[in-house]
Amino acid sequence: MTLKINSCKNDINNHTYLIGILLLGLISGLTFNLIFFTVPYQLSEAKYTTDIIGSISLAAFPYCLKVIWSPFIDKYSIPFLCSKFGHRRGWALVSQIFLILAMTGFLNINPCNNLYITAIILFIISSCSSTQDIVLDAYRIERPTSKEELSMAFTFSSIGFRLGMLLGSVGTLYSSIIFGWNTVYKSALFITLIGPIVILCIKEPQSKEIHHTTTHLIGLQQYFEVIKKSIISLKNEQQYLLLIILFIFLYKAADSIPMAMSSPLLLDLSFTTHEIAVIYKAYGLLIMIVGGALSGVLAAKMGIFHSVLIGGVIQLLSPLMFMILATIGYDIKTFIITVTVQNFCAGFAGTIISIYFASLCNSEFVATQYSIIASFSSLSRIILASLGGICAKYLTWPVFFLGNTLFSMLFIPIFYKIYRKKLGFVNISKKI
């Protein structure tokens, strides 16, 4: 009887922890979409040019600079909060509090009339959100006690992130029509308020309860020592680390550029707000979740190595379909096919590459190592989104997406070398 009760308690704890990861992922997806879709869409409606819209994406630069402050999150304990709630939860609370303050400030401006102030506040929001992401990434790696739990943690986080993107897109579009943009941002703030409550409800990972941290600000020497040890540890386990990083940098190019330029393209092709909300966002999210779930099943059967290759190849179909759509013009059937292909590829490749990132990290420097790896992926997305806006201004849409496809193919020869020499993929046979 006692064993059954203990088993039920463990099930409840696991259930709470996974739901918590899902909700935090939702907040992360919501704030991410605020920068990459909501504000760009509002600016598109106001007839701003693609180069200005693409430049707003630079406000998300903190997402690719997580490595700069991840050593502090690994080694520095915030007085009172970390001792009271645990190392990871203490940092999560701080990031949530400042995120809420930044979101509150965003309510007092009109992005269309205050571009510079908008960019500054979005930069602050992305800094807070990326800090939360560092903590969440470490939490979902440290908390699981088995390979199956690791897969579930990333799956729930991925689903939550995409639900947040749905709220930040479909919810944004409909709310802006019915209630106006100010109500949209008020709703986003209200959802963000859930974050601190979730953090208080989940448990601190056991591995962090005995983690060697300090309440004194680490000096520059200690700071760089943490980064150095993190990189050396990665390099010791993963030969030719720079080649792997370059591969990661290019891997998401076929997805990041179409995502950033989708709003201007769809508006240029005269798709209505209703069509974009229902087909591109609502239907697209469902397909993305299917792609992510299938990648987990495939990884369990074929291993991470082959799943990553499949994900990278099928991603090339995404810009190709946008090229076809841009050539044909307004056509609902082609639009649905394009959305299906893009979102399935994004869900599949996005989930499997995240699991691969986690497999590269060791327990001592989880936050720093994962940030180092993920930063290069984010760098690809953010820089290419910004440059994509400039290129789209001078190229026709079909030529633009053809160039996107050709550029994205550069990952193939790099992956081929990795495949031939088995570089980096120490866990080729690892099943997750």
From Swiss-Prot:
* Intracellular or extracellular location(s): Cell inner membrane
Q: Name any one GO molecular function.
A: transmembrane transporter activity
Q: What membrane topology does this protein have?
A: Multi-pass membrane protein
Question: Which keywords accompany this UniProt record?
Answer: Cell inner membrane, Cell membrane, Membrane, Transmembrane, Transmembrane helix, Transport
User: What's the domain of life for this entry?
Assistant: Bacteria
Q: Which residues cross the membrane?
A: 17-37, 52-72, 90-110, 115-135, 150-170, 177-197, 241-261, 285-305, 308-328, 335-355, 372-392, 395-415
Cellular compartments per GO CC: plasma membrane
Q: Which family does it belong to?
A: Belongs to the major facilitator superfamily.
PANTHER family per the record? MAJOR FACILITATOR SUPERFAMILY DOMAIN-CONTAINING PROTEIN 3, SOLUTE CARRIER FAMILY 33 ACETYL-COA TRANSPORTER -RELATED
Q: What name appears for this protein in its UniProt entry?
A: Putative transporter AmpG 3
Q: Per the UniProt entry, what species is this protein from, by scientific name?
A: Rickettsia conorii (strain ATCC VR-613 / Malish 7)
